[in-house]
């Protein structure tokens, strides 16, 4: 293999096999290898139309998604240079990279508030629709092995980031090395991707390697624990590439789940017993835990930061394989790795085939075909990165153990040298400190003091109120005298600042501490609160207008749409589950901060049942309609249908939207549908009617019984109008993924005069998140048969009219509401 174009061409061999599965949190979208190849070729043609030529730089700045993948391969197919940017990077960094790389085009995302405007660009969210009309063209000649394929900018500490030049040869070499190291991987496996694709570790191990072998990659929209665990349990995942911080998050999620059931002690006893058992018995012992990860999950691939012995032991004891590797972006990036059949705890494994490693004064130095040629237009940095005899200086400190495996001691730049000349490796102290009760997060840095450096701990407490001095004293009890922590600071935010791969930005922490005159045991308050910035960004408000006591609705103008955006943004930023039902008119900004800090469990939604859409219960509906519903309806309603021919071309689920005048709207509309659609359609009903504000016990019994009947015999599910909307939205997404259409009444209540009422904003959220066509429906005559307020129906004629399907998912929220209202009103006139 000489370049990534060979991987792209291999997509043709895998045809309809799933290449990418994207879980938006609402829907599940699949892209086959054949579809991905066509998207890439069309993207190349589109880039040609935009004036992008061979060797031109294209900035790729967005979250992991099918569109990101299509854009990447389109740039490769065009012969351009991919310039990936961390999705969470700020606008200034993106501008700096665009300027330094001389990018001529950008692919960016609407998920960010700020966008690049200095160069032509396209939004990732628009790519699918935009490429539909693009005619594929013959691809340009294949690139030479030494042509630049990617320009990857390092995260850096201070100053301008450096552009790492990676050629087609570099990437192809490392891809061959990685796949050769793990012959167990095959096209039958699915991989869960949790790290940003702009990070080379994820790109090589979790993106290029699986696609080159015909595997399936699963992306999730947010990294909250529930989304990750749902992907594990529903997607038949075999392996996941992760950094240690993500493994810690998953470990905490497992421990909390056991503790919530009163089984925390049992889990600890199982973990203690497991090391003495053979692998098969370990797997049997931890069957309850393994079920949470799916029946085929087997492998954690860890990299990007040192893996603690505690994390390795936890997952290994549970019967999972944990393979740790090591590398740098400059090396494409993988240099060493443990093997699936053999792991050495605390070591990062053995050099990949073709990788040479040596230690010079403790520094790890490497060379091989995967090592980059230099930094982009930075000759001084390039010369400083290589020795006179051509070895790349990694800047990492290491040693080789008795098995020949490499052990990484830490970054040379992070090494703390005390005034006594003692070398202190902060990673070793962090591992001890993180185990102490009262610590949520921590890092250890060197602070200038007495002609050397003080070993200084920065601690995020867990909310238990335990004094920091007590925490540090306990940690020091497990550390030898020469390396003990001699200073500490309380970090007042919920998390330490991190990169998108969850590494702590120690340089940022140190800069903040150096700015404080009272560094030692002071409380550190960040100059710009991350949570306040997030709220202000979502709501489009200046920072000084968002205060802890501000009411989100009354003071800040939080709408139903903005509430969903805010909850999603919080979950993405803080990697937690947040119940949108907990955010109401009386919720203050400080209340939400408390929810984040407490990481409260989200209550299970009420009445959302997927099993009522199964074949069995669709049969129940057929039976109920045949012997009860249709005969009863025909006693009062003479039903006729217009426009049914407009439904003939429907090839999948849709959203039927209708005016609402009577309790009989739903059966009249469903009986107007052909049977193939009728029993694959679920109806949204006002949740508050069934579950809220009972006047007495009899009304409670009646309403709850009515819901049970409607759910089982009519295919109804609850849709709240106040709070808790997102749970119902997720339910609608799952129904759509199972091929079920939806019937909703966007007015939200029955019209008492018969005139169409304004549609609620929730419809726009449904259309955009579900990405389904909208079929307008008008029902005339029921306001005379059973109007609002009537207790008994009269006889009358009813007409149901269907309009042309509308594709509105890529229009604005306001346009969706306007177009939908006009379509239904047009059928009523």
Regions found by a protein language model. Give the residues of each.
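Conserved pre-ATP/AMP-binding loop-to-beta segment of ANL
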Residues: 16-18, 135-153, 160, 184-190
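Conserved AMP-binding/adenylate-forming core of the ANL superfamily
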Residues: 20-65, 69-73, 90-95, 168
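Conserved ATP-dependent adenylate/AMP-binding module captured primarily in the ANL superfamily
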Residues: 72, 87-116, 132-134, 174-192, ...
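AMP-binding/adenylate-forming catalytic core of the ANL superfamily
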Residues: 106, 359, 368, 373-374, ...
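Conserved AMP-binding/adenylation subdomain of ANL enzymes
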Residues: 172-190, 197-287
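Conserved AMP-binding/adenylate-forming
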Residues: 281-406, 412-415, 429, 440
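Non-catalytic C-terminal accessory region of glycerolipid acyltransferases
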Residues: 468, 514, 648, 723-829
């Amino acid at each position: 293999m000489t370049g990534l174009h060979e991987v792209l061409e291999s997509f043709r061999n895998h045809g309809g096999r799933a290449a990418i599965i994207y879980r938006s949190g609402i829907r599940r979208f699949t892209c086959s290898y054949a579809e991905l190849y066509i998207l890439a070729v069309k993207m190349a043609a589109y880039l040609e139309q935009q004036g992008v030529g061979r060797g031109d730089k294209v900035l790729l700045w967005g979250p992991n998604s099918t569109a990101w993948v299509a854009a990447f391969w389109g740039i490769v197919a065009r012969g351009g240079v991919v310039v990936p940017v961390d999705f969470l990077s700020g606008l200034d960094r993106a501008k700096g990279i665009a300027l330094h790389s001389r990018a001529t085009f950008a692919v960016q995302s609407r998920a960010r508030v700020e966008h690049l405007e200095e160069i032509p660009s396209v939004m990732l969210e628009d790519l699918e629709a935009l490429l539909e009309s693009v005619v594929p063209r013959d691809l340009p000649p294949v690139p030479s092995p030494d042509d630049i394929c990617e320009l990857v900018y390092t995260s850096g500490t201070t100053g301008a980031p450096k552009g790492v030049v990676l050629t087609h040869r570099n990437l192809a070499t490392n891809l061959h090395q990685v796949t050769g190291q793990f012959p167990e991987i095959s096209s039958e496996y699915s991989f869960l991707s949790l790290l940003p694709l702009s990070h080379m570790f994820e790109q090589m191990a979790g993106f290029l390697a699986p696609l080159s072998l015909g595997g399936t990659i699963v992306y999730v929209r947010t990294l909250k624990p529930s989304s990750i665990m749902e992907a594990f349990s529903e997607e038949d995942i075999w392996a996941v590439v992760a950094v240690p911080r993500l493994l810690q998050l998953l470990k905490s999620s497992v421990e909390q789940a056991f503790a919530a059931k009163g089984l925390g002690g049992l889990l600890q006893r199982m973990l203690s017993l497991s090391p003495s058992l053979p692998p098969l018995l370990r797997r049997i012992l931890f069957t309850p835990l393994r079920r949470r990860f799916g029946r085929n999950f087997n492998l954690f691939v860890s990299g990007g930061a040192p893996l603690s012995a505690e994390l390795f032991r936890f997952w290994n004891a549970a019967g999972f394989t944990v393979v740790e590797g090591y590398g740098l972006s400059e090396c494409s990036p993988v240099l060493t790795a443990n093997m699936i059949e053999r792991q050495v705890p605390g070591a990062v494994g053995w050099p990949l085939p073709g990788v040479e490693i040596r230690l010079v004064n403790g520094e790890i130095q490497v060379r091989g075909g995967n090592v980059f040629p230099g930094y982009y237009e930075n000759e001084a940095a390039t010369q400083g990165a290589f020795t006179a005899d051509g070895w790349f200086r990694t800047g990492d400190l290491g040693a080789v153990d008795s098995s020949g495996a490499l052990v990484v001691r830490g970054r040379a730049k992070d090494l703390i040298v005390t005034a006594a000349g003692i070398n202190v490796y902060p990673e070793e102290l962090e591992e001890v400190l993180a185990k102490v009760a009262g610590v949520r997060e921590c890092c250890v840095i060197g602070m200038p003091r007495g002609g050397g450096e003080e070993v200084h701990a920065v601690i995020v407490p867990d909310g238990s109120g335990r004094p920091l001095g007590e925490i540090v004293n306990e940690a020091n009890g497990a550390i030898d005298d020469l390396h003990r922590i001699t200073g500490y600071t309380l970090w007042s935010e919920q998390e330490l600042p991190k990169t998108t791969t969850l590494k702590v930005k120690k340089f940022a922490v140190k800069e903040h501490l150096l700015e404080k005159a009272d560094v030692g045991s002071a409380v550190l308050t960040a100059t710009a609160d991350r949570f306040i910035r997030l709220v202000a960004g979502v709501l489009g408000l200046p920072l000084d207008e968002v205060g802890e006591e501000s009411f989100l609705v009354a003071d800040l103008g939080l709408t139903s749409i903005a509430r969903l955006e805010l909850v999603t943004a919080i979950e993405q930023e803080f990697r937690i589950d947040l119940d949108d039902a907990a955010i109401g008119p009386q919720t203050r900004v400080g209340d939400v901060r408390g929810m984040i800090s407490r990481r409260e469990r989200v209550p299970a939604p009420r009445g959302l049942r997927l099993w009522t859409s199964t074949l069995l219960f669709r049969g129940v509906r057929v039976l109920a309609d045949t012997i009860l519903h249709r005969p009863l309806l025909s006693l009062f309603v003479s039903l006729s249908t217009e426009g049914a021919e407009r439904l003939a071309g429907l090839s999948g689920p849709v959203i039927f939207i209708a005016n609402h005048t009577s309790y009989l709207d739903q059966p009249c509309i469903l009986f107007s549908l052909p049977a193939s659609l009728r029993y694959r359609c679920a109806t949204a009903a006002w949740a508050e009617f069934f579950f809220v504000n009972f006047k007495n016990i009899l009304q409670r019994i009646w309403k709850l019984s009515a819901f049970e009947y409607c759910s089982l015999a009519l295919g109804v599910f609850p849709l709240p109008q106040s709070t808790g909307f997102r749970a119902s939205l997720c339910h609608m997404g799952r129904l759509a993924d199972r091929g079920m259409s939806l019937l909703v009444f966007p007015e939200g209540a029955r019209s008492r005069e018969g005139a169409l009422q304004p549609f609620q904003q929730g419809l726009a959220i449904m259309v955009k998140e579900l990405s389904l066509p909208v079929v307008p429906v008008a029902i005339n005559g029921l306001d005379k048969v059973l109007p609002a307020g009537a207790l008994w129906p009269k006889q009358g004629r009813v007409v149901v009219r269907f309009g042309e399907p509308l594709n509105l998912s890529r229009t604005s929220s306001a346009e969706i509401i306007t177009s939908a209202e006009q379509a239904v009103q047009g059928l009523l006139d």
